[in-house]
Amino acid sequence: DWDDYVGRLAIGRLFNGRVRKGEEIAICRLDGAFAPAKVSVLYGYEGLRRIEVAEAGPGDIVAVAGLEEVQIGETLSDREDPRPLPPIHVDEPTITMVLSINDSPFSGREGRHVTSRKLKERLERERLVNVSIRVEPTESADAFRVSGRGELQLAILIEMMRREGYELSVGKPQAITRAQDGVVREPMEMLAIDCPEEFIGVVTQKMGERRGRMMKMSNHGSGRVRMEFRVPSRGLIGFRTEFLTDTRGTGIMNHLFDGWEPWQGDIEHRATGTLVADRQGRATAYSIENLQPRGALFLSPGDEVYEGMVIGEHARGNDLDVNVTKEKKLSNMRASGSDDMIRLIPPRLMNLEQALEFIRDDELVEVTPAAVRLRKRVLAANRRK
């Protein structure tokens, strides 16, 4: 953990002996080396509250300050008689995405932290607290590659940053691959699903589309069935929300990292293109009504748009630049009652997870405290063609 006043905290359970504030101890490194250290502050726990204590004994869960270089899995031991315990291993990250500053025309309107320096500080602070998160620089000083154990973990981090007042752009999540013996391998997950019997068909169909293989299925006659699948980590991107919708909120799913396997093949993404705003302004009901036959729209009348912003899903496979700010021309010719006949279909609203699954490599998710928007990586239409 991390504390703004005392720095990094090593949290663990005391197996034997006693530890006291100010005591000289040894850190047993994972490579077998020993490093001297001192307990500057010692904390215990009282329920969910962390309290400072003078000493602790066997079985106590404590947090030790003053150990800036300690890593998970290392042992804190007596300096005169160091005895390392078996190390704890943390699963390797399986999903990565690039987080960058928000450079859209709406940048700085809705957030308090908008610079790359603020973004880097926040990600570094998260790396100190969350041992399963990795933060790496990219070729751009304004972008950082963040890796974690899954799309949900990274989405939670982005949602936390959004609520803290950060503005950022997020690229498409990708699986981390590795080359072994000349073969590209990808991370696999063991997925356990518990759902009512009537949803077996839709769940197995969705798993098949995501390169999942059923390993086991059991039905104990209670009306619910348990299924186990082996599926690529990238196959689970966006699946949780889809699964809850398909099972009407009655399904339960959990997954664990289950090794590496050769690349399982391409997973079909959306076959449709997008509707892209070609100018800045406010969406009008007149334009939205005329664009409804072209596809599903993501916005309502009065919403602000900018050039390059994705405003809908095209019914065809290509991207289409459209003018959603066009207003109806006034004239002296009127048909009785015709001005009141605008019929609008409710917009399709997306949460952060759905947006991350929807985008392609040439698109980004713009995340601000007030909104989640989709946009093209290159905003100007003449530069995209």
Predicted segments, located by residue:
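Conserved nucleotide-binding/hydrolysis modules and their immediate coupling elements
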Residues: 1-97, 107-109, 272, 279-331, ...
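Phosphate-interacting basic helix/loop segments used at nucleotide- and nucleic-acid interfaces
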Residues: 8, 116-142, 198-202, 210, ...
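Residue-level signature of catalytic and energy-coupling elements of molecular machines
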Residues: 22, 59, 73, 99, ...
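A short, contiguous, amphipathic alpha-helix enriched in charged residues
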Residues: 27-29, 104-128, 341, 345-347
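Interdomain boundary/hinge elements
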Residues: 31-42, 53-57, 84-102, 130-142, ...
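Short glycine/threonine-rich beta-strand-turn micro-motifs
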Residues: 138-153
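Contiguous effector/interaction surfaces
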Residues: 190-206, 210-213, 226-340
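Acidic, low-complexity intrinsically disordered tails
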Residues: 371-373, 379-385
